[in-house]
Amino acid sequence: MKALWAVLLVTLLTGCLAEGEPEVTDQLEWQSNQPWEQALNRFWDYLRWVQTLSDQVQEELQSSQVTQELTALMEDTMTEVKAYKKELEEQLGPVAEETRARLGKEVQAAQARLGADMEDLRNRLGQYRNEVHTMLGQSTEEIRARLSTHLRKMRKRLMRDAEDLQKRLAVYKAGAREGAERGVSAIRERLGPLVEQGRQRTANLGAGAAQPLRDRAQAFGDRIRGRLEEVGNQARDRLEEVREHMEEVRSKMEEQTQQIRLQAEIFQARLKGWFEPIVEDMHRQWANLMEKIQASVATNPIITPVAQENQ
């Protein structure tokens, strides 16, 4: 009976908490243009799924699956925020050092708050897992009710700090754009007089020095043409010399080839003259040997063992 009253009390408390603190359904009000915003939206979607506390969520909460996923999403978000902040720092350009330091501190503080919120959320989920494990099969409705309330509060705080970080980064980006525009203006102011002087000098050259430049260019062109003709003649002469040399080399090679062929034929004839008598003599000796063997066999027949036994 006491257990039944405890369940009813927990149900009433859960209903009161739900009525006193409605479900957060607000969305982050910006377009996910930057990589850090896209990473934060992935974290936000996963948190929304965890907040449902469905059977699958509760099952994964009892293991380390949820905290591992949240840790990975947190690290991705913080990494993208740092990368975007570094990119904006490189674009600040000639902004005053005081302004740079102030903007950097504001962004860093907002970034730290968001990171602390994420860390607090992960720790709270780990605490829930430990509490569930210590219940040893008892009812966990009260623990889930407290977790649901805490998740709603954490989601509000995360939204507030995320929007604050987005605003700080927007101010930082505006400062970077302003610094870049100032840098371009300063460069334009410095280069403006130089460009004007160059334009005037070009106009003066066009008005008073055009003819000397044309004469000089004509003379230079004549020298170039003469030099090219000279180089062409030298190249033709050199090519003719190379062709004659190659023809001479070819003739010598043909002559040497003919001599080698004749020497080979002479050597072949000598070898033939050396070995033919020897081969003929060996043939004669072999024929004589065979005749002697045949004659010996004919005069002395071989007596087989069978014949001896018959005798």
From Swiss-Prot:
Protein residues bound to heparin: 154-157, 221-228
SUPFAM superfamilies to which the protein is assigned, alphabetical: Apolipoprotein A-I
Which segments carry the region annotation Specificity for association with VLDL? 270-282
In terms of Pfam families, this protein maps to: Apolipoprotein
Q: Where is this region: Lipid-binding and lipoprotein association?
A: 202-282
> Mostly located where?
secreted
Q: What is this protein called?
A: Apolipoprotein E
Organism listed in the record: Mus musculus (Mouse)
